[in-house]
Amino acid sequence: AAGLASQGMLPVVCIYSTFLQRSYDQIIHDVNLLKENVVFAIDRAGFVPADGETHQGIYDPAFLSQVGMPIYSPSNYAELKYWLPILLSNEMQGPRAIRYPRGGESKALAQYGCSGKEYDHLYTAPGAKIVLVSYADEVEDVLNAAKLLGAENIPCDVYKLVKIFPFTEELIREIMR
């Protein structure tokens, strides 16, 4: 992919999250340090119960953020359809990644559609002093947790990220309010 990018092409590397770990050296040296235009389309991102304990897609956000790569992790098809063309366009330069889970779309998350923003404030509880931040299909569990906590008089707000790295100053300031 780095070789194709060095010749002006825009390669898309479609790969399971767990197998992406094995290419970390090439990501650092051949793609990231040279700021090559490569899109990593990361399948099986997040928890993948049916694939066994060695195939959990949980490490790529940590190691891709270490090298400063922008990472997007939509929570539904509408967000994926919106953000993928942007990542494939000339609007973005350098390496970038988009993650998506195994399987279909959650009906609960589908209802949120796509705002076109890098993050959304999904749930506001009066008097909340706790903020839960999540992304991808884990947002559904976090929303449920916020409602359970609310029932115990522990109000929480919930933010859903699409762009999970890097955080913008705007996001940090909003969460701190």
Predicted ranges, named:
Residues 124, 136-137, 142-177:
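Generic long, charged, amphipathic alpha-helical segments
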